Amino acid sequence: MRRFTVRGSIVDSWVEFSASSSAARRVVLQVAPRERPRDLVIVEAPPSLLPDVGWLEDLGSNLCHGSPVAAVGRLDPRGCLAASELVLER
């Protein structure tokens, strides 16, 4: 599989939690790519890729809309980017 990179702005975000605990399981971002902002890309990432717990809280509360993001990973069969690298800026 090829590695894929998307750079753009966060349009929407949410945090999915494990059913058996209150620990975050996955962060999901809708990203508007710089080159094609109407072609939204869904980025899924483990919380461990976030720089700090503040980002986790802000993404879960939708406080990061419009923030720049760069994500690198592989496209899964659904067309979502499974991120292995994530760079977030405020």
Where are the predicted features?
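OB-fold and OB-like single-stranded nucleic-acid-recognition modules
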Residues: 1-90
